[in-house]
Curated annotation (Swiss-Prot):
Belongs to the NGG1 family. Residues 40-69, 367-407 form a coiled coil. The keyword Iron-sulfur does not apply. Pfam families: Ada3. Residues 293-305 have a biased composition (Polar residues). PANTHER family: TRANSCRIPTIONAL ADAPTER 3 (PTHR13556:SF2), TRANSCRIPTIONAL ADAPTER 3-RELATED (PTHR13556). This is Transcriptional adapter 3. The gene is tada3. The keyword ATP-binding does not apply. One of its GO terms (cellular component) is nucleus. Disulfide bonds: none annotated. Its main location: nucleus.
């Protein structure tokens, strides 16, 4: 009975959680059938109620662990007292109760075994105590309540947007405002390329060249016939195509000059279509002369077109000169086909890109201006904090003087007034 009275256990009265009152949603879900299931809108309420049950169970578990630890400590202290009492009895020479079985065990082991000293029974009893209170199962791990760090993560994500602006960020904005080197490439229109008919003709010639080379390898006879065709390369193919184009591109009237050159010459030459008959006598031509002349001018020579070198370069130079004199309008871009849908779409997207680039550049300039203004305000706020510290130092000095029951000196008063006026001037700059 005395041991029970000395027992330090508190025997807590655990209050059970009223599920109906504190966890109504949890109780309702348990009363349902498996087919009903749980709705999505009920998950938040269920989570809160389950956390309430978990916290209650964790609290009870901690109390039980504390009680177990108290009981273990009390038993250890009680055993230590018994060991001390046993050691004192050994020193006084009093007989030990229940010592016969121990002596028999010691005698059975050997005659050279010494009797139990004052320290040996204590170690053996400690081992018995450890075996008595040895837990067979592992202690139950207390489930930790998950830490709700959502606010910390939120403020950590918001902090970069609320922090002070640095010089590195100003430099980044200035670098963004610089015009990229490849910006002009986005507004260039790629060349149209060769027409499909020309490309097909070139491919056909190259194909014939390859076929000729293959057939030339098969036999010596065919090699003699197709040899020149097999030795053609891509440059020869292009020259052949250009030659054929030049033959087909001759104007109907046989004049090699361009339209601009012809118009310029027509404007400069005076026309005199009707002339008096007296001024232009028709010479009589004899039969021989006419026969010889007729023989000399054959129909083939009359049908041969007139050719002149460098007609294209002459056309270009005349056009440039007329544009320089202001007689012709300059064509910034070549004539375009109105039915070219790809080119129209490309120009549309280029116009949108140009407008978007201008808008982005204006916004970046506005952002840079606001960032520089904010940098100035940050410097003013830093000066306000320094002025606040000076005002507080002056206030502490004056309060220390009053606690010592002495009047503040003129220097301390002037320093306080100076700090106040400086702070007020900085605040005006900050508000302005």
């Amino acid at each position: 009975m005395s041991e029970l009275k000395d027992c330090p256990l508190q025997f807590h009265d655990f209050k059970s959680v009223d599920h109906v009152k504190l966890c109504p949603r949890y109780t309702a879900v348990l009363s349902r059938s498996e087919d009903d299931g749980i709705g999505i809108e009920e998950l938040d309420t269920l989570q809160l109620e389950l956390e309430t049950l978990l916290s209650s169970a964790s609290r009870r578990l901690r109390v039980l662990e504390a009680e177990t630890q108290i009981l273990t400590d009390w038993q250890d202290k009680k055993g230590d007292r018994r060991f001390l009492k046993l050691g004192k009895e050994h020193e006084l020479g009093t007989p030990i109760k229940h010592s016969k079985p121990k002596k028999q065990k010691l005698d059975g082991k050997g005659s050279h075994a010494s009797g139990p000293g004052p320290g040996r029974p204590k170690s053996r009893n400690m081992q018995q105590k450890m075996q008595e209170y040895e837990f067979t199962d592992d202690p139950v791990d207390v489930p930790r309540i998950p830490k709700n760090d959502a606010p910390n993560r939120f403020w950590a994500s918001v902090e970069p947007y609320c922090a002070d602006i640095t010089n590195d960020e100003i430099k980044v904005l200035e670098d963004l405002l610089k015009t990229p080197e490849d910006e002009a490439d986005y507004y260039k229109i790629p060349p149209l390329g060769k027409h499909y008919s020309q490309r097909w003709a070139q491919e056909d010639l190259l194909e014939e060249q390859k076929d000729g080379a293959r057939t030339a390898l098969s036999g010596d006879k065919k090699k003699g016939i197709l040899g020149p065709l097999a030795e053609l390369d891509s440059k020869d193919v292009d020259s052949l195509l250009k030659k054929s184009e030049s033959q087909h591109d001759q104007p109907e009237d046989g004049c090699p000059f361009g339209h601009l050159t012809q118009r310029l010459l027509q404007a400069l030459v005076e026309e005199n279509i009707i002339s008096p008959v007296e001024d232009s006598p028709i010479p009589e031509i004899s039969g021989k002369e006419s026969g010889t002349d007729g023989a000399s001018t054959s129909p083939r020579s009359q049908n041969k077109p007139f050719s002149a070198p460098h007609t294209k370069s002459l056309e270009v130079r005349i056009k440039e000169e007329l544009i320089a004199q202001g007689l012709l309008e300059s064509d910034d871009r070549p004539a375009e086909d109105s039915e070219d849908e790809v080119l129209a779409e490309l120009r549309k997207r280029q116009a949108e890109l140009k407008a978007l680039s201008a808008h982005n550049r204006a916004k970046k300039q506005e952002l840079l201006r606001l960032a520089k203004e904010e940098m100035n305000r940050q410097e003013l706020r830093q000066r306000v904090r320094m002025a606040d510290n000076e005002v507080m130092d002056a206030f502490r000095k004056i309060m220390a003087a009053r606690q010592k029951k002495r009047t503040p000196t003129k220097k301390e008063k002037d320093q306080a007034w100076k700090a106040l006026k400086e702070r007020e001037s900085i605040l005006k700059l900050l508000d302005g």
